Amino acid sequence: MLTRVPVLILAVIVMLALCQEPEKPEKRPALLSRYGRAVLPRYGKRSGNLMESSQNSLTEESSDVVCQLIDGKYICLPVDAVRFRPFFL
Protein backbone atom coordinates (compact mmCIF):
# COMPACT_ATOMS: atom_id res chain seq x y z
CA MET A 1 0.00 0.00 0.00
CA LEU A 2 2.78 2.43 0.86
CA THR A 3 4.49 1.82 -2.49
CA ARG A 4 1.31 2.24 -4.52
CA VAL A 5 0.59 5.80 -3.34
CA PRO A 6 3.89 7.34 -4.57
CA VAL A 7 3.57 5.40 -7.85
CA LEU A 8 0.01 6.67 -8.38
CA ILE A 9 1.05 10.24 -7.57
CA LEU A 10 3.96 9.96 -10.00
CA ALA A 11 1.65 8.53 -12.68
CA VAL A 12 -0.83 11.40 -12.22
CA ILE A 13 1.96 13.99 -12.47
CA VAL A 14 3.33 12.36 -15.64
CA MET A 15 -0.15 12.21 -17.21
CA LEU A 16 -0.79 15.88 -16.41
CA ALA A 17 2.55 16.84 -17.90
CA LEU A 18 1.87 14.88 -21.10
CA CYS A 19 -1.68 16.20 -21.54
CA GLN A 20 -0.72 19.87 -21.46
CA GLU A 21 -0.77 21.73 -24.77
CA PRO A 22 2.63 22.62 -26.15
CA GLU A 23 3.53 26.22 -25.55
CA LYS A 24 3.82 28.56 -28.50
CA PRO A 25 7.26 30.06 -28.99
CA GLU A 26 7.50 33.66 -27.88
CA LYS A 27 7.58 36.27 -30.60
CA ARG A 28 10.53 38.53 -30.18
CA PRO A 29 10.44 42.08 -31.47
CA ALA A 30 12.32 42.71 -34.70
CA LEU A 31 15.98 43.57 -34.36
CA LEU A 32 16.43 47.24 -35.01
CA SER A 33 19.62 49.01 -35.91
CA ARG A 34 20.65 52.14 -34.09
CA TYR A 35 18.77 54.15 -36.75
CA GLY A 36 15.47 52.37 -36.10
CA ARG A 37 15.47 50.30 -39.28
CA ALA A 38 15.01 46.56 -39.28
CA VAL A 39 18.19 44.52 -39.50
CA LEU A 40 17.94 42.22 -42.50
CA PRO A 41 19.66 38.86 -42.86
CA ARG A 42 22.73 38.75 -45.06
CA TYR A 43 21.00 37.28 -48.10
CA GLY A 44 17.67 39.07 -47.70
CA LYS A 45 18.67 42.57 -48.69
CA ARG A 46 16.00 44.87 -50.03
CA SER A 47 18.14 45.97 -52.96
CA GLY A 48 17.68 42.54 -54.56
CA ASN A 49 13.95 43.13 -54.86
CA LEU A 50 14.56 46.47 -56.54
CA MET A 51 16.80 44.84 -59.12
CA GLU A 52 14.16 42.25 -59.96
CA SER A 53 11.51 44.91 -60.43
CA SER A 54 13.80 46.95 -62.69
CA GLN A 55 14.54 43.87 -64.80
CA ASN A 56 10.83 43.19 -65.16
CA SER A 57 10.23 46.75 -66.34
CA LEU A 58 13.02 46.41 -68.91
CA THR A 59 11.53 43.25 -70.37
CA GLU A 60 8.11 44.88 -70.60
CA GLU A 61 9.45 47.90 -72.48
CA SER A 62 11.53 46.00 -75.04
CA SER A 63 9.90 42.67 -75.68
CA ASP A 64 11.56 42.10 -79.10
CA VAL A 65 15.25 41.29 -78.94
CA VAL A 66 17.80 39.93 -81.38
CA CYS A 67 20.35 37.45 -80.03
CA GLN A 68 23.59 36.25 -81.59
CA LEU A 69 25.97 33.56 -80.35
CA ILE A 70 29.56 34.83 -80.29
CA ASP A 71 32.39 32.82 -78.70
CA GLY A 72 29.93 30.67 -76.76
CA LYS A 73 28.09 33.66 -75.27
CA TYR A 74 24.74 35.03 -76.33
CA ILE A 75 24.57 38.76 -76.97
CA CYS A 76 21.00 40.04 -77.03
CA LEU A 77 20.04 43.55 -78.04
CA PRO A 78 16.66 45.20 -78.55
CA VAL A 79 15.38 45.38 -82.10
CA ASP A 80 15.19 49.17 -81.79
CA ALA A 81 18.95 49.50 -81.25
CA VAL A 82 19.79 51.20 -84.57
CA ARG A 83 23.45 51.76 -83.76
CA PHE A 84 24.00 48.01 -83.21
CA ARG A 85 22.26 46.77 -86.37
CA PRO A 86 25.44 46.61 -88.49
CA PHE A 87 26.89 44.34 -85.81
CA PHE A 88 24.22 41.71 -86.48
CA LEU A 89 24.38 41.79 -90.29
From Swiss-Prot:
Expressed in the M1 and M2 pharyngeal neurons from where the LURY-1-1 and LURY-1-2 peptides are secreted. GO terms for molecular function: neuropeptide receptor binding. GO terms for cellular component: extracellular region. Residues 20-26, 47-89 form a propeptide. The modification Tyrosine amide is found at Y35, Y43. Residues 1-19 form the signal peptide. Disruption phenotype: Eggs are retained in the body as normal during starvation but the number of eggs laid during the initial refeeding period is reduced and satiety-induced suppression of pharyngeal pumping is slower than wild-type. One of its GO terms (biological process) is negative regulation of locomotion. Keywords: Amidation, Cleavage on pair of basic residues, Neuropeptide, Secreted, Signal. This is Luqin-like RYamide peptides lury-1.
